[in-house]
């Protein structure tokens, strides 16, 4: 990249300070690097945060740290009975891991289009799928897997009602939605299980990692055992209790999905900054919304109760432009603005196309319409107002130069 093309506004940068560095060094010097005391403390503190909106002491959130959202989704689906001969319902407008986790377990995926005016799965269309399946008994559906795209929370009231009616589990893919506080509690605590991501670009990061939350002790127990090889004892217990470390049982063919203390140390510091990070994200989003409110070729992103503003999904009114989304993105990058695209619908990928001839953009028009219009703009806590204004000005400049009228 030449000097003139260096990005003035990076798409994303993690907000890491000396506090996180000191926490990591402390773990390194402790002599215990893998999953142990620090991870247990991180899990407790995360649970305390999520429980802060709950009144029922009998329905408290249990948190289990994992090495990625993907790992957490596999644990969650496995605990909910997703396996060969069963199916889940989810959206094609998501990162591939949401659906791939079901395939790893041998299950089928029934895709449901998104709402016309948002990026989230359409609860009314979920209902249509369930009504039809009740007639045909074509699939043994075990779970609905809503994805809170960009931190904008799905219609959980309707989804939970459907789950109760059809005796299904709800597994929230909450990779984008921390902290999304709603009148039903935090996103990720509304369904049977919620799975968060702590990837480098997420609102809370550990570099790589995630957290699984549930209020069901039995589900928690199953996931805890499966998280670490199916052992009936944790690593910390094996090496800190009087009982010999080699005395354990393997009760199931588990996975290796644990989060080490080094990464949990970062997470504990980040968790303390959650509210500050959220306010900064909300501030940048408000600057964008205000800057684009009178721009006819830009549509402001949907905003729900509890929006975490993980991403700012700018939708282009292509009818007002002479260029398409890809060219608009290219020109933004030429102007020094880092951009991305969330997400490429899964029906554009060869693996998923080859599984089902009917899995096409024509059968998921809302997802396709959002895809061809959307550009993800920079949004991160340490962004300055100047960076936001540079982004707004670049969008307006490019749109004005390429206006159709």
Q: Which residues are covered by each model-predicted region?
A:
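PLP-dependent aminotransferase class I/II
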Residues: 39-45, 51-52, 56-61, 113, ...
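N-terminal "arm"/small-domain region of PLP-dependent enzymes with the aminotransferase-like
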Residues: 1-33, 37, 248-251, 378
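Conserved active-site segment immediately N-terminal to the catalytic lysine
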Residues: 172-205, 221, 246-251
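Phosphate-binding glycine-rich loop
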Residues: 32-87, 101-103, 111, 136
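Glycine-/small-residue-rich active-site loops that bind phosphorylated ligands and cofactors
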Residues: 16, 34, 94, 117-118, ...
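PLP-dependent aminotransferase-like
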Residues: 78-165, 169-174, 181
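Active-site PLP attachment segment
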Residues: 189-233, 261
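Structural detector of well-ordered beta-strand residues that form the stable sheet scaffold
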Residues: 89, 110, 170-171, 195, ...
């Amino acid at each position: 990249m030449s000097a003139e093309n260096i990005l003035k506004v990076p798409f994303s940068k993690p907000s890491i300070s000396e506090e996180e560095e000191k926490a990591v060094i402390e773990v390194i010097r402790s002599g215990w690097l893998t999953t142990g005391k620090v991870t247990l403390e991180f899990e407790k503190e995360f649970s305390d945060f999520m429980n802060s909106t709950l009144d029922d002491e009998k329905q408290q959130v249990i948190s289990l740290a994992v090495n990625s959202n993907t790992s957490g989704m596999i644990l969650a689906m496995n605990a909910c009975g997703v396996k060969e001969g069963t199916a889940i319902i989810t959206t094609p407008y998501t990162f591939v891991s949401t659906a791939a986790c079901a395939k790893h377990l041998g299950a089928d995926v029934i895709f449901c289009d998104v709402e016309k005016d948002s990026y989230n799965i359409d609860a009314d269309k979920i209902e249509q799928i369930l009504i039809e399946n009740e007639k045909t008994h074509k699939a043994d559906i075990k779970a609905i897997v809503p994805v809170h795209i960009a931190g904008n929370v799905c219609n959980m009231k309707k989804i939970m009602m459907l789950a109760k009616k059809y005796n299904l589990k709800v597994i929230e893919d909450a990779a984008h939605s921390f902290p999304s506080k709603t009148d039903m509690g935090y996103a990720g605590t509304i369904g049977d299980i919620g799975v968060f991501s702590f990837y480098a670009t997420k609102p809370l990061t550990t570099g790589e990692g995630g957290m699984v939350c549930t209020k069901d002790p039995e589900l928690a127990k199953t996931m805890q055992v499966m998280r670490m090889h199916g052992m009936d004892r944790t690593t910390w217990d094996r090496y800190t209790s009087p009982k010999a470390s080699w005395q354990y049982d393997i009760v199931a063919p588990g996975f290796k999905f644990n989060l080490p203390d080094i990464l949990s140390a970062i997470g504990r510091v980040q968790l303390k900054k959650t509210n500050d990070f959220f306010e900064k994200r909300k501030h940048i989003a408000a600057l964008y919304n205000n800057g684009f409110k009178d721009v006819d070729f830009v549509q402001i992103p949907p905003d729900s109760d509890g929006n975490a503003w993980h991403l700012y999904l700018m939708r282009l009114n292509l009818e007002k432009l002479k260029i398409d989304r890809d060219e608009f993105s290219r020109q933004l990058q030429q102007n020094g603005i880092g951009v991305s695209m969330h997400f490429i619908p899964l029906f554009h990928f060869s693996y998923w196309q080859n599984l089902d001839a009917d899995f096409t953009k024509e059968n998921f028009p809302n997802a396709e319409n959002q895809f061809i219009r959307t550009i993800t703009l920079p949004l991160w806590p340490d962004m300055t107002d100047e960076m936001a204004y540079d982004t707004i000005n670049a969008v307006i400049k490019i749109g004005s130069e390429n206006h159709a009228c």
